Protein backbone atom coordinates (compact mmCIF):
# COMPACT_ATOMS: atom_id res chain seq x y z
CA UNK A 1 0.00 0.00 0.00
CA UNK A 2 2.80 2.41 0.89
CA UNK A 3 4.40 1.93 -2.51
CA UNK A 4 1.22 3.13 -4.23
CA UNK A 5 0.65 6.19 -2.01
CA UNK A 6 3.00 8.48 -4.00
CA UNK A 7 1.15 7.60 -7.20
CA UNK A 8 -2.28 8.15 -5.62
CA UNK A 9 -1.05 11.42 -4.13
CA UNK A 10 0.10 12.59 -7.55
CA UNK A 11 -3.29 11.76 -9.06
CA UNK A 12 -5.04 13.66 -6.26
CA UNK A 13 -2.74 16.64 -6.92
CA UNK A 14 -3.62 16.57 -10.63
CA UNK A 15 -7.32 16.34 -9.80
CA UNK A 16 -7.05 19.40 -7.56
CA UNK A 17 -6.04 21.35 -10.64
CA UNK A 18 -8.35 19.72 -13.15
CA UNK A 19 -11.49 18.81 -11.17
CA UNK A 20 -11.72 20.71 -7.89
CA UNK A 21 -10.17 24.11 -8.66
CA UNK A 22 -12.93 26.77 -8.60
CA UNK A 23 -15.50 23.97 -8.79
CA UNK A 24 -18.37 26.20 -7.68
CA UNK A 25 -17.41 29.33 -9.61
CA UNK A 26 -19.55 28.55 -12.66
CA UNK A 27 -23.30 28.96 -12.03
CA UNK A 28 -25.48 25.91 -12.54
CA UNK A 29 -26.12 25.80 -16.26
CA UNK A 30 -28.09 24.03 -18.95
CA UNK A 31 -31.16 21.88 -18.50
CA UNK A 32 -29.82 19.19 -16.17
CA UNK A 33 -27.65 20.86 -13.53
CA UNK A 34 -30.34 23.08 -11.94
CA UNK A 35 -32.93 20.29 -11.86
CA UNK A 36 -30.62 17.62 -10.48
CA UNK A 37 -29.24 20.02 -7.87
CA UNK A 38 -32.74 20.97 -6.76
CA UNK A 39 -33.83 17.32 -6.52
CA UNK A 40 -30.82 16.51 -4.34
CA UNK A 41 -31.66 19.47 -2.10
CA UNK A 42 -35.28 18.39 -1.75
CA UNK A 43 -34.19 14.83 -1.04
CA UNK A 44 -32.10 16.07 1.87
CA UNK A 45 -34.63 18.62 3.12
CA UNK A 46 -37.69 16.35 2.93
CA UNK A 47 -36.00 13.05 3.71
CA UNK A 48 -37.54 11.42 0.63
CA UNK A 49 -34.67 9.06 -0.21
CA UNK A 50 -36.67 6.77 -2.51
CA UNK A 51 -38.78 8.83 -4.92
CA UNK A 52 -36.87 11.84 -6.32
CA UNK A 53 -38.94 15.02 -5.97
CA UNK A 54 -38.85 18.31 -7.88
CA UNK A 55 -40.98 20.98 -6.26
CA UNK A 56 -42.64 18.27 -4.21
CA UNK A 57 -43.69 16.25 -7.26
CA UNK A 58 -42.19 12.88 -8.31
CA UNK A 59 -39.35 13.19 -10.83
CA UNK A 60 -39.06 9.75 -12.35
CA UNK A 61 -36.69 10.26 -15.28
CA UNK A 62 -33.45 9.13 -13.60
CA UNK A 63 -32.39 6.71 -10.84
CA UNK A 64 -31.25 8.11 -7.49
CA UNK A 65 -27.47 7.57 -7.26
CA UNK A 66 -26.48 11.16 -8.11
CA UNK A 67 -29.03 12.53 -5.64
CA UNK A 68 -27.89 10.14 -2.89
CA UNK A 69 -24.26 11.12 -3.42
CA UNK A 70 -24.96 14.85 -3.62
CA UNK A 71 -27.54 15.43 -0.88
CA UNK A 72 -25.08 15.17 2.07
CA UNK A 73 -22.75 17.76 0.53
CA UNK A 74 -25.42 20.45 0.96
CA UNK A 75 -24.77 20.11 4.69
CA UNK A 76 -21.02 20.53 4.16
CA UNK A 77 -20.60 23.29 1.56
CA UNK A 78 -22.16 26.74 1.80
CA UNK A 79 -21.78 27.31 -1.95
CA UNK A 80 -24.63 25.42 -3.62
CA UNK A 81 -22.76 25.01 -6.89
CA UNK A 82 -19.86 23.30 -5.11
CA UNK A 83 -22.24 21.01 -3.24
CA UNK A 84 -24.02 20.06 -6.46
CA UNK A 85 -20.77 19.22 -8.27
CA UNK A 86 -18.53 17.79 -5.58
CA UNK A 87 -19.98 14.28 -5.83
CA UNK A 88 -19.37 13.91 -9.58
CA UNK A 89 -15.87 15.41 -9.21
CA UNK A 90 -15.10 12.88 -6.48
CA UNK A 91 -16.48 10.12 -8.71
CA UNK A 92 -14.18 11.28 -11.52
CA UNK A 93 -11.18 11.03 -9.20
CA UNK A 94 -12.23 7.54 -8.08
CA UNK A 95 -12.61 6.55 -11.74
CA UNK A 96 -9.05 7.67 -12.44
CA UNK A 97 -7.74 5.83 -9.38
CA UNK A 98 -9.53 2.67 -10.54
CA UNK A 99 -7.78 3.04 -13.92
CA UNK A 100 -4.48 3.30 -12.05
CA UNK A 101 -5.38 0.21 -10.01
CA UNK A 102 -6.30 -1.75 -13.14
CA UNK A 103 -3.22 -0.63 -15.08
CA UNK A 104 -0.95 -1.44 -12.13
CA UNK A 105 -2.46 -4.89 -11.70
CA UNK A 106 -2.40 -5.90 -15.36
CA UNK A 107 0.75 -4.07 -16.49
CA UNK A 108 2.79 -1.78 -14.23
CA UNK A 109 2.39 1.17 -11.90
CA UNK A 110 3.90 3.42 -14.55
CA UNK A 111 1.28 2.31 -17.07
CA UNK A 112 -1.51 2.79 -14.55
CA UNK A 113 -0.26 6.24 -13.59
CA UNK A 114 0.02 7.38 -17.20
CA UNK A 115 -3.45 6.09 -18.09
CA UNK A 116 -5.03 7.71 -15.04
CA UNK A 117 -3.21 11.00 -15.70
CA UNK A 118 -4.43 11.01 -19.29
CA UNK A 119 -7.98 10.52 -18.06
CA UNK A 120 -7.71 13.28 -15.42
CA UNK A 121 -6.47 15.79 -17.99
CA UNK A 122 -8.82 14.94 -20.87
CA UNK A 123 -11.01 17.99 -21.35
CA UNK A 124 -14.23 16.06 -21.96
CA UNK A 125 -13.77 13.83 -18.93
CA UNK A 126 -12.94 16.85 -16.78
CA UNK A 127 -15.98 18.70 -18.09
CA UNK A 128 -18.34 15.92 -17.07
CA UNK A 129 -16.50 15.52 -13.78
CA UNK A 130 -17.17 19.17 -13.00
CA UNK A 131 -20.87 18.91 -13.90
CA UNK A 132 -23.88 18.23 -11.72
CA UNK A 133 -25.24 15.28 -13.68
CA UNK A 134 -25.74 11.53 -13.52
CA UNK A 135 -23.05 10.72 -16.10
CA UNK A 136 -19.98 10.65 -13.87
CA UNK A 137 -21.43 8.66 -10.93
CA UNK A 138 -22.62 6.07 -13.47
CA UNK A 139 -19.24 6.01 -15.21
CA UNK A 140 -17.44 5.67 -11.88
CA UNK A 141 -19.44 2.64 -10.76
CA UNK A 142 -19.30 1.05 -14.20
CA UNK A 143 -15.52 1.56 -14.39
CA UNK A 144 -15.04 -0.01 -10.97
CA UNK A 145 -17.15 -2.97 -12.07
CA UNK A 146 -15.25 -3.51 -15.32
CA UNK A 147 -11.85 -2.98 -13.66
CA UNK A 148 -12.55 -5.67 -11.05
CA UNK A 149 -13.88 -8.00 -13.74
CA UNK A 150 -10.82 -7.39 -15.93
CA UNK A 151 -8.41 -8.20 -13.13
CA UNK A 152 -10.40 -11.35 -12.47
CA UNK A 153 -10.80 -12.79 -15.96
CA UNK A 154 -8.31 -11.06 -18.28
CA UNK A 155 -5.05 -11.98 -16.54
CA UNK A 156 -2.76 -14.12 -18.73
CA UNK A 157 -2.66 -16.83 -16.07
CA UNK A 158 -6.41 -17.36 -16.38
CA UNK A 159 -6.23 -18.58 -19.97
CA UNK A 160 -6.01 -22.31 -20.26
CA UNK A 161 -6.51 -21.91 -24.01
CA UNK A 162 -3.59 -19.50 -24.29
CA UNK A 163 -0.39 -21.52 -23.93
CA UNK A 164 1.62 -18.72 -25.56
CA UNK A 165 0.74 -16.34 -22.73
CA UNK A 166 3.08 -16.68 -19.72
CA UNK A 167 1.50 -16.80 -16.29
CA UNK A 168 3.23 -15.60 -13.17
CA UNK A 169 2.39 -17.11 -9.82
CA UNK A 170 0.29 -14.12 -8.91
CA UNK A 171 -1.54 -14.07 -12.24
CA UNK A 172 -2.32 -17.77 -12.11
CA UNK A 173 -4.55 -17.45 -9.07
CA UNK A 174 -8.27 -17.74 -9.68
CA UNK A 175 -10.20 -14.53 -9.00
CA UNK A 176 -12.32 -16.18 -6.32
CA UNK A 177 -15.00 -14.33 -4.42
CA UNK A 178 -13.37 -10.92 -5.01
CA UNK A 179 -14.86 -10.82 -8.49
CA UNK A 180 -18.30 -10.51 -6.88
CA UNK A 181 -17.50 -6.88 -6.09
CA UNK A 182 -17.77 -6.25 -9.84
CA UNK A 183 -21.44 -7.17 -9.65
CA UNK A 184 -22.00 -4.96 -6.61
CA UNK A 185 -20.69 -1.94 -8.50
CA UNK A 186 -22.71 -3.00 -11.54
CA UNK A 187 -25.81 -2.78 -9.34
CA UNK A 188 -24.76 0.72 -8.28
CA UNK A 189 -24.23 1.63 -11.95
CA UNK A 190 -27.84 0.60 -12.61
CA UNK A 191 -28.86 2.98 -9.83
CA UNK A 192 -26.74 5.59 -11.59
CA UNK A 193 -28.40 5.53 -14.99
CA UNK A 194 -30.62 2.51 -15.38
CA UNK A 195 -30.63 -0.88 -17.12
CA UNK A 196 -28.22 0.33 -19.80
CA UNK A 197 -25.47 -0.71 -17.36
CA UNK A 198 -26.52 -4.36 -17.70
CA UNK A 199 -26.71 -4.06 -21.49
CA UNK A 200 -23.20 -2.61 -21.76
CA UNK A 201 -21.71 -5.06 -19.27
CA UNK A 202 -23.30 -8.02 -21.08
CA UNK A 203 -22.01 -6.72 -24.42
CA UNK A 204 -18.48 -6.25 -23.11
CA UNK A 205 -18.40 -9.65 -21.43
CA UNK A 206 -19.80 -11.46 -24.46
CA UNK A 207 -17.45 -9.65 -26.85
CA UNK A 208 -14.42 -10.50 -24.71
CA UNK A 209 -15.43 -14.13 -24.24
CA UNK A 210 -15.96 -14.56 -27.99
CA UNK A 211 -12.78 -12.79 -29.16
CA UNK A 212 -10.74 -14.59 -26.54
CA UNK A 213 -11.97 -17.84 -28.13
CA UNK A 214 -13.81 -18.85 -24.98
CA UNK A 215 -10.44 -19.03 -23.21
CA UNK A 216 -12.02 -18.20 -19.87
CA UNK A 217 -13.72 -20.69 -17.63
CA UNK A 218 -17.12 -19.06 -17.16
CA UNK A 219 -17.32 -20.55 -13.68
CA UNK A 220 -14.63 -18.07 -12.67
CA UNK A 221 -16.99 -15.24 -13.62
CA UNK A 222 -19.44 -16.34 -10.88
CA UNK A 223 -22.30 -15.09 -13.03
CA UNK A 224 -25.22 -16.55 -11.07
CA UNK A 225 -24.04 -15.36 -7.67
CA UNK A 226 -22.93 -12.07 -9.18
CA UNK A 227 -26.22 -11.24 -10.86
CA UNK A 228 -28.00 -12.11 -7.63
CA UNK A 229 -25.85 -9.47 -5.93
CA UNK A 230 -26.54 -6.98 -8.73
CA UNK A 231 -30.26 -7.52 -8.27
CA UNK A 232 -29.97 -7.25 -4.49
CA UNK A 233 -28.29 -3.85 -4.86
CA UNK A 234 -30.52 -2.35 -7.55
CA UNK A 235 -33.96 -4.00 -7.56
CA UNK A 236 -35.19 -2.77 -4.13
CA UNK A 237 -35.17 0.87 -5.26
CA UNK A 238 -37.05 0.08 -8.47
CA UNK A 239 -39.63 -1.96 -6.58
CA UNK A 240 -40.11 0.70 -3.92
CA UNK A 241 -40.57 3.52 -6.44
CA UNK A 242 -42.94 1.37 -8.51
CA UNK A 243 -44.92 0.53 -5.38
CA UNK A 244 -45.28 4.24 -4.55
CA UNK A 245 -45.83 5.63 -8.06
CA UNK A 246 -47.34 2.75 -10.02
CA UNK A 247 -47.22 2.56 -13.79
CA UNK A 248 -46.36 6.26 -14.05
CA UNK A 249 -42.84 5.15 -13.10
CA UNK A 250 -42.80 2.39 -15.73
CA UNK A 251 -44.10 4.76 -18.39
CA UNK A 252 -41.75 7.62 -17.57
CA UNK A 253 -38.54 5.81 -16.70
CA UNK A 254 -38.49 2.56 -18.65
CA UNK A 255 -40.61 3.36 -21.70
CA UNK A 256 -39.98 7.06 -22.28
CA UNK A 257 -36.46 7.63 -20.98
CA UNK A 258 -34.91 4.28 -21.85
CA UNK A 259 -36.68 2.45 -24.69
CA UNK A 260 -38.11 5.45 -26.56
CA UNK A 261 -34.97 7.51 -25.98
CA UNK A 262 -32.85 4.81 -27.60
CA UNK A 263 -35.20 3.78 -30.40
CA UNK A 264 -36.62 7.17 -31.44
CA UNK A 265 -35.71 10.83 -31.70
CA UNK A 266 -38.49 11.81 -29.30
CA UNK A 267 -36.07 13.78 -27.11
CA UNK A 268 -34.61 15.71 -30.07
CA UNK A 269 -31.06 14.36 -29.78
CA UNK A 270 -30.81 12.71 -33.20
CA UNK A 271 -27.33 12.72 -34.72
CA UNK A 272 -25.55 10.94 -37.61
CA UNK A 273 -24.30 7.38 -37.14
CA UNK A 274 -20.64 8.53 -37.03
CA UNK A 275 -21.40 11.27 -34.51
CA UNK A 276 -19.14 9.76 -31.86
CA UNK A 277 -15.96 9.83 -33.96
CA UNK A 278 -15.43 13.61 -33.66
CA UNK A 279 -16.93 13.52 -30.17
CA UNK A 280 -14.21 11.10 -29.04
CA UNK A 281 -11.53 13.42 -30.39
CA UNK A 282 -13.07 16.30 -28.49
CA UNK A 283 -13.62 14.39 -25.24
CA UNK A 284 -10.03 13.15 -25.08
CA UNK A 285 -8.40 16.44 -26.15
CA UNK A 286 -5.48 17.20 -25.88
CA UNK A 287 -4.61 13.49 -25.80
CA UNK A 288 -6.44 12.75 -29.05
CA UNK A 289 -3.33 14.06 -30.77
CA UNK A 290 -1.41 11.12 -29.33
CA UNK A 291 -3.43 8.51 -31.23
CA UNK A 292 -0.58 7.89 -33.75
CA UNK A 293 1.05 5.82 -30.99
CA UNK A 294 -1.42 3.15 -32.11
CA UNK A 295 0.04 3.12 -35.63
CA UNK A 296 1.65 0.01 -37.05
CA UNK A 297 3.80 -0.52 -40.11
CA UNK A 298 1.63 -3.53 -41.01
CA UNK A 299 -1.87 -2.99 -39.55
CA UNK A 300 -3.48 -5.71 -41.66
CA UNK A 301 -0.97 -8.23 -40.37
CA UNK A 302 -1.78 -7.18 -36.80
CA UNK A 303 -5.50 -7.66 -37.42
CA UNK A 304 -4.94 -11.12 -38.93
CA UNK A 305 -3.02 -12.05 -35.78
CA UNK A 306 -5.96 -11.20 -33.53
CA UNK A 307 -6.04 -14.73 -32.11
CA UNK A 308 -2.65 -14.03 -30.54
CA UNK A 309 -3.64 -10.72 -28.98
CA UNK A 310 -3.05 -10.23 -25.31
CA UNK A 311 -6.33 -11.00 -23.48
CA UNK A 312 -5.79 -7.92 -21.32
CA UNK A 313 -5.82 -5.73 -24.40
CA UNK A 314 -8.79 -7.60 -25.83
CA UNK A 315 -10.80 -6.78 -22.72
CA UNK A 316 -9.92 -3.07 -22.88
CA UNK A 317 -10.78 -2.89 -26.58
CA UNK A 318 -14.16 -4.55 -25.98
CA UNK A 319 -14.80 -2.21 -23.07
CA UNK A 320 -14.00 0.79 -25.25
CA UNK A 321 -15.88 -0.29 -28.38
CA UNK A 322 -19.15 -1.69 -27.00
CA UNK A 323 -20.55 1.61 -25.61
CA UNK A 324 -19.50 3.50 -28.75
CA UNK A 325 -21.07 0.96 -31.11
CA UNK A 326 -24.19 0.50 -28.99
CA UNK A 327 -24.98 4.21 -28.79
CA UNK A 328 -24.05 4.79 -32.44
CA UNK A 329 -27.14 2.76 -33.31
CA UNK A 330 -29.30 4.85 -30.97
CA UNK A 331 -31.57 7.51 -32.44
CA UNK A 332 -30.72 9.73 -29.46
CA UNK A 333 -27.05 10.64 -29.11
CA UNK A 334 -25.37 12.79 -26.48
CA UNK A 335 -21.66 13.09 -25.76
CA UNK A 336 -22.07 11.79 -22.21
CA UNK A 337 -23.43 8.45 -23.39
CA UNK A 338 -19.94 7.21 -24.32
CA UNK A 339 -18.24 8.48 -21.17
CA UNK A 340 -17.75 4.83 -20.01
CA UNK A 341 -15.49 4.34 -23.05
CA UNK A 342 -12.96 6.94 -21.92
CA UNK A 343 -11.33 5.02 -19.01
CA UNK A 344 -10.31 2.00 -21.15
CA UNK A 345 -9.24 4.27 -24.01
CA UNK A 346 -7.07 6.33 -21.65
CA UNK A 347 -5.49 3.16 -20.29
CA UNK A 348 -4.83 1.79 -23.80
CA UNK A 349 -3.14 5.08 -24.67
CA UNK A 350 -1.22 4.86 -21.40
CA UNK A 351 0.03 1.39 -22.36
CA UNK A 352 1.43 2.68 -25.64
CA UNK A 353 2.88 5.79 -24.00
CA UNK A 354 4.62 3.56 -21.46
CA UNK A 355 6.06 1.51 -24.31
CA UNK A 356 7.25 4.71 -25.98
CA UNK A 357 9.00 5.74 -22.76
CA UNK A 358 10.73 2.35 -22.62
CA UNK A 359 11.65 2.63 -26.31
CA UNK A 360 9.89 -0.59 -27.30
CA UNK A 361 7.86 0.94 -30.15
CA UNK A 362 9.03 2.60 -33.35
CA UNK A 363 10.17 6.22 -32.99
CA UNK A 364 8.05 7.32 -35.95
CA UNK A 365 4.92 6.76 -33.86
CA UNK A 366 6.03 9.26 -31.22
CA UNK A 367 7.03 11.81 -33.85
CA UNK A 368 3.71 11.37 -35.65
CA UNK A 369 1.94 11.90 -32.32
CA UNK A 370 3.84 15.14 -31.82
CA UNK A 371 2.86 16.38 -35.27
CA UNK A 372 -0.82 15.48 -34.92
CA UNK A 373 -0.98 16.90 -31.39
CA UNK A 374 0.41 20.19 -32.66
CA UNK A 375 -2.05 20.20 -35.58
CA UNK A 376 -5.04 19.58 -33.30
CA UNK A 377 -3.85 22.17 -30.79
CA UNK A 378 -3.23 24.76 -33.50
CA UNK A 379 -6.67 24.15 -35.00
CA UNK A 380 -8.38 24.70 -31.66
CA UNK A 381 -6.19 27.70 -30.86
CA UNK A 382 -6.97 29.41 -34.18
CA UNK A 383 -10.69 28.67 -33.95
CA UNK A 384 -11.07 29.88 -30.34
CA UNK A 385 -11.01 33.68 -30.99
CA UNK A 386 -13.45 33.40 -33.89
CA UNK A 387 -15.76 31.18 -31.83
CA UNK A 388 -15.82 33.58 -28.89
CA UNK A 389 -16.28 36.52 -31.25
CA UNK A 390 -19.35 34.94 -32.82
CA UNK A 391 -20.97 33.19 -29.86
CA UNK A 392 -20.14 35.43 -26.91
CA UNK A 393 -20.78 39.01 -27.87
CA UNK A 394 -17.48 39.80 -29.54
CA UNK A 395 -15.29 38.62 -26.66
CA UNK A 396 -12.54 37.40 -28.97
CA UNK A 397 -9.77 38.38 -26.55
CA UNK A 398 -10.73 35.58 -24.16
CA UNK A 399 -10.66 33.12 -27.06
CA UNK A 400 -7.24 34.44 -28.06
CA UNK A 401 -5.94 34.01 -24.52
CA UNK A 402 -7.18 30.42 -24.39
CA UNK A 403 -5.69 29.77 -27.81
CA UNK A 404 -2.28 30.91 -26.60
CA UNK A 405 -2.48 28.67 -23.53
CA UNK A 406 -3.21 25.73 -25.84
CA UNK A 407 -0.61 26.48 -28.48
CA UNK A 408 2.50 27.34 -26.45
CA UNK A 409 2.67 24.03 -24.50
CA UNK A 410 1.85 22.18 -27.73
CA UNK A 411 5.09 23.46 -29.26
CA UNK A 412 7.01 22.08 -26.29
CA UNK A 413 5.27 18.72 -26.70
CA UNK A 414 6.13 18.75 -30.39
CA UNK A 415 9.78 19.53 -29.73
CA UNK A 416 10.13 16.81 -27.13
CA UNK A 417 8.51 14.17 -29.36
CA UNK A 418 10.81 15.02 -32.26
CA UNK A 419 13.80 14.56 -29.95
CA UNK A 420 12.37 11.29 -28.63
CA UNK A 421 11.94 12.58 -25.07
CA UNK A 422 8.62 10.92 -24.33
CA UNK A 423 8.45 11.64 -20.58
CA UNK A 424 8.93 15.36 -21.16
CA UNK A 425 6.41 15.34 -24.01
CA UNK A 426 3.89 13.58 -21.78
CA UNK A 427 4.49 16.05 -18.95
CA UNK A 428 4.11 19.00 -21.32
CA UNK A 429 0.72 17.69 -22.46
CA UNK A 430 -0.43 17.24 -18.85
CA UNK A 431 0.62 20.83 -18.12
CA UNK A 432 -1.09 22.02 -21.31
CA UNK A 433 -4.39 20.66 -20.06
CA UNK A 434 -3.97 21.97 -16.50
CA UNK A 435 -2.99 25.44 -17.73
CA UNK A 436 -5.96 25.50 -20.09
CA UNK A 437 -8.35 24.50 -17.29
CA UNK A 438 -6.88 27.20 -15.04
CA UNK A 439 -7.41 29.93 -17.64
CA UNK A 440 -10.89 28.68 -18.54
CA UNK A 441 -12.00 28.78 -14.91
CA UNK A 442 -10.39 32.17 -14.31
CA UNK A 443 -11.36 34.07 -17.45
CA UNK A 444 -13.97 32.14 -19.44
CA UNK A 445 -16.27 31.02 -16.62
CA UNK A 446 -17.67 34.52 -15.92
CA UNK A 447 -18.55 34.85 -19.60
CA UNK A 448 -19.93 31.32 -19.91
CA UNK A 449 -22.00 31.84 -16.77
CA UNK A 450 -23.53 34.96 -18.27
CA UNK A 451 -24.63 33.07 -21.38
CA UNK A 452 -25.54 29.63 -20.06
CA UNK A 453 -27.00 30.45 -16.67
CA UNK A 454 -29.25 33.09 -15.10
CA UNK A 455 -27.85 33.42 -11.58
CA UNK A 456 -27.13 37.15 -11.71
CA UNK A 457 -30.36 38.20 -13.36
CA UNK A 458 -32.39 35.89 -11.09
CA UNK A 459 -30.84 37.43 -7.98
CA UNK A 460 -31.48 40.88 -9.43
CA UNK A 461 -35.14 40.01 -10.03
CA UNK A 462 -35.59 38.79 -6.46
CA UNK A 463 -33.87 41.92 -5.14
CA UNK A 464 -36.12 44.35 -7.07
CA UNK A 465 -39.33 42.36 -6.86
CA UNK A 466 -42.21 43.81 -4.86
CA UNK A 467 -44.07 41.44 -2.50
CA UNK A 468 -46.33 39.15 -4.53
CA UNK A 469 -45.14 40.57 -7.86
CA UNK A 470 -45.09 37.85 -10.56
CA UNK A 471 -41.93 36.86 -12.43
CA UNK A 472 -42.30 35.36 -15.89
CA UNK A 473 -40.33 34.75 -19.05
CA UNK A 474 -41.07 35.90 -22.59
CA UNK A 475 -39.91 33.85 -25.60
CA UNK A 476 -37.30 32.32 -23.34
CA UNK A 477 -36.90 29.31 -21.07
CA UNK A 478 -34.00 28.44 -18.79
CA UNK A 479 -34.10 25.87 -15.99
CA UNK A 480 -31.52 27.79 -14.00
CA UNK A 481 -33.89 30.78 -13.73
CA UNK A 482 -36.36 28.58 -11.90
CA UNK A 483 -33.60 27.25 -9.66
CA UNK A 484 -32.06 30.61 -8.75
CA UNK A 485 -35.43 32.26 -8.10
CA UNK A 486 -36.45 29.41 -5.82
CA UNK A 487 -38.98 28.23 -8.42
CA UNK A 488 -40.90 31.51 -8.20
CA UNK A 489 -41.18 31.98 -11.98
CA UNK A 490 -44.93 31.98 -12.58
CA UNK A 491 -45.25 31.21 -16.27
CA UNK A 492 -43.68 31.34 -19.73
CA UNK A 493 -45.26 33.45 -22.50
CA UNK A 494 -44.39 33.12 -26.17
CA UNK A 495 -46.47 35.75 -28.01
CA UNK A 496 -47.43 39.42 -27.71
CA UNK A 497 -51.13 38.80 -27.16
CA UNK A 498 -50.47 36.56 -24.16
CA UNK A 499 -48.20 39.22 -22.68
CA UNK A 500 -50.84 41.94 -23.11
CA UNK A 501 -53.53 39.73 -21.57
CA UNK A 502 -51.28 38.97 -18.60
CA UNK A 503 -50.58 42.71 -18.15
CA UNK A 504 -54.31 43.43 -17.94
CA UNK A 505 -54.67 40.93 -15.09
CA UNK A 506 -51.43 41.94 -13.34
CA UNK A 507 -50.65 45.68 -13.56
CA UNK A 508 -47.04 45.18 -12.39
CA UNK A 509 -44.74 42.23 -13.03
CA UNK A 510 -41.17 41.33 -13.99
CA UNK A 511 -40.12 39.70 -17.25
CA UNK A 512 -36.88 37.95 -18.16
CA UNK A 513 -36.31 37.76 -21.90
CA UNK A 514 -33.58 37.85 -24.50
CA UNK A 515 -32.41 41.05 -26.20
CA UNK A 516 -34.64 40.27 -29.18
CA UNK A 517 -37.65 39.87 -26.89
CA UNK A 518 -36.88 43.19 -25.23
CA UNK A 519 -37.08 44.94 -28.61
CA UNK A 520 -40.53 43.45 -29.18
CA UNK A 521 -41.77 44.43 -25.73
CA UNK A 522 -40.50 48.00 -25.82
CA UNK A 523 -42.22 48.47 -29.18
CA UNK A 524 -45.64 47.47 -27.82
CA UNK A 525 -48.05 50.36 -27.14
CA UNK A 526 -50.31 48.37 -24.80
CA UNK A 527 -47.67 48.07 -22.08
CA UNK A 528 -44.91 50.14 -20.53
CA UNK A 529 -41.52 48.48 -20.03
CA UNK A 530 -38.58 49.67 -17.93
CA UNK A 531 -35.18 47.90 -18.09
CA UNK A 532 -33.86 46.83 -14.69
CA UNK A 533 -30.81 44.76 -15.53
CA UNK A 534 -29.02 42.51 -17.99
CA UNK A 535 -26.82 39.43 -18.07
CA UNK A 536 -25.19 38.35 -21.30
CA UNK A 537 -27.99 38.27 -23.86
CA UNK A 538 -30.72 38.35 -21.20
CA UNK A 539 -32.72 41.37 -20.07
CA UNK A 540 -34.81 42.01 -16.96
CA UNK A 541 -37.82 44.31 -17.47
CA UNK A 542 -40.53 45.73 -15.26
CA UNK A 543 -43.84 45.69 -17.12
CA UNK A 544 -46.90 47.85 -16.46
CA UNK A 545 -50.19 47.98 -18.30
CA UNK A 546 -50.24 51.35 -20.11
CA UNK A 547 -53.92 51.89 -19.27
CA UNK A 548 -53.23 51.25 -15.60
CA UNK A 549 -50.31 53.69 -15.74
CA UNK A 550 -52.51 56.43 -17.26
CA UNK A 551 -55.21 55.89 -14.63
CA UNK A 552 -52.67 56.39 -11.89
Regions found by a protein language model. Give the residues of each.
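Membrane-embedded architecture of ER/inner-membrane glycosylation machinery
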Residues: 180, 184, 294-546, 552
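Membrane-integral, polyisoprenol-dependent glycosyltransferases
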Residues: 2-362, 535-537
Amino acid sequence: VRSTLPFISLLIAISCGSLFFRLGSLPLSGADEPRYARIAQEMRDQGSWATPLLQGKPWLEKPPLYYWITAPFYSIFEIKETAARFGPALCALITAISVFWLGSGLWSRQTGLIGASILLTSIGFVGFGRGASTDMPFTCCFTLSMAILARGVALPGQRAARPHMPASGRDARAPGWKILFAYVFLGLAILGKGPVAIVLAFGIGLCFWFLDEQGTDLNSWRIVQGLALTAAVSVPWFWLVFHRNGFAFVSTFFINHNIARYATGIHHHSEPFLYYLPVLLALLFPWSGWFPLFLSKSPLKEIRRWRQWDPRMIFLICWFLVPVIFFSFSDSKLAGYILPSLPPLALILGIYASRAIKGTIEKFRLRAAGVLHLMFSASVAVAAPFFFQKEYGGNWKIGLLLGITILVPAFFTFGFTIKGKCIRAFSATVLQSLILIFFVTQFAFPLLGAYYSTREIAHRALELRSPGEPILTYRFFQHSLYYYTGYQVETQLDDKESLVQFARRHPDFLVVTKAEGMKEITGMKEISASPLGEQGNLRLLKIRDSKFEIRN
